[in-house]
Amino acid sequence: MARAIRAARFDNLWTAVELFNELSEEELLQGEKACIHYDKPIRISELRSQILKVQRDDVQCTKDDGQCTKEELPSLEINFCDMVCEDPFFLASSAICTNYEMVARALEAGWAGVFYKTITKGDIREVSPRFDAVRKEGTPFVGFRNMEQLSENPYTMDFEILHRLKENYPTKRIIASIMGQTEEEWIELAKMAEEAGCDAVELNFSCPQMRLTGLGSDIGQNPELILFYTSYVRDAVKIPVIPKMTPNIMSMTSPALACFYAGASGISAINTIKSITMSDSAEVSGKKTISGYSGKAVKPIALRMIYEMTGNPILHKAGIEKHMDISGIGGIETWRDALEFIQLGCRNVQVCTAVMQYGYRIIDDLKAGLQHYMAERGITELKKLVGEELKNIVLPSDLDRETMVYPLIDKTQCIGCGRCYVSCMDGGHQAIEFGEDRKPKIIGAKCVGCHLCRLVCPTGAIGIAKRIPKRQ
């Protein structure tokens, strides 16, 4: 039952439908007594009813009833930086992968690989507390702030861990993330990663909260330094070299070109965004500081920066897409989030904040959701999804401005809360009537089709009508 609820939470409706169908009424009642959310039971029976209402086309597979077994679902195998990966889902370099036991559990759970927490020869001393969250009403946090830096382990210990991981999990991709303070340190750490058996090395040019200047995002903001350090590491090792980019810049074009000209095999993007929160929970002995912001809230920013590389005519002219692969990072929580990065050209995705919230177990729904989506579309290879939406990203000047789409209200789903009315009155075009029957009505002569009402509706009662020419 818990697995069914989790599948629904992470938008894997195929698995949720299958598992809820297997539950008896007695099991549902027992589950509702046992499952408590804050101070009240989870309404599992109601959740099950809603899930089973979902209408979907039969999955393309060999079964007569249209239902795929795990073995019949499409493979998620994909080539990334000349590494064959069993799926595109990797752990991002962070607190979720700081020792052997953690990474081993993740790999056994189904993750295809890991970008291990950044290794350095420097003395790392972390602060306490070092995490904070941005919340929205009753939701889990949508934004996450952290003040962590790099691995606190002795660097020799970390490379021993990576060696053990590769020995014990030879089919998984083990990637060392490193940060040096000098040219010599960058080269030494990269060589140690190669000697440990790592499949690739990531260069951390992007940590936004380093105690010392001239490290992390200070490098990532300077294309000359990116070119300098990447070139030296590229010449020192034979394994793929993957610089990790900072979002704390105006454009990704120059940093990406620097990586390309230095001979990088790929790029990881993005790291966290510089931020400040003012809550008491973020204080360290009464003081606050600038640090990294991540989570669901940063996904649109991450996607924009991915597009600045994969959809950039300057980079295309240089031939960058033929020589460098992109690993997408930033706000990935469900398989749909991952799909968006893949459709913009990523061949690999990394997850951190969602794992910190929900655990390594989310990999089940990341993989199953993406596989079922591919099966429904009849897609047999993940690489066919890579970059397929790039053609639909255009300049603002190229958008259709002569037609509009009215919102469409389903009164059977409307609960009469008035949220749409308030938002339209105070933030829109006063195009909704809200009478004594507490049922909203669209005023066509005033509506401009902005769809603010649809976005604030708590029940999904407002949909989309057909696109029509704008009224004159």
Question: Each predicted region: which residue ranges?
Answer:
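Iron-sulfur cluster-binding cysteine motifs and their immediate structural context
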Residues: 1-10, 29-51, 341, 419-437, ...
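Ferredoxin-like iron-sulfur electron-transfer modules
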Residues: 14-37, 397-416, 430-449, 462-472
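Alpha/beta enzyme core
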Residues: 104-109, 181-327, 335-340, 344-348, ...
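Hydrophobic faces of well-ordered beta-strands that scaffold small-molecule active sites
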Residues: 87-93, 114-117, 174-178, 201-203, ...
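N-terminal capping/small domains of soluble enzymes
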Residues: 70-174, 180-181
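Short, basic, low-complexity termini and linkers enriched in Ser/Thr/Gly/Pro
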Residues: 45-71, 318, 469-472
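Extended, intrinsically disordered, low-complexity segments
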Residues: 138-141, 295, 299, 304, ...
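C-terminal helical cap(s) of enzyme catalytic domains, especially alpha/beta-barrels
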Residues: 126-140, 278-291, 343, 354-379
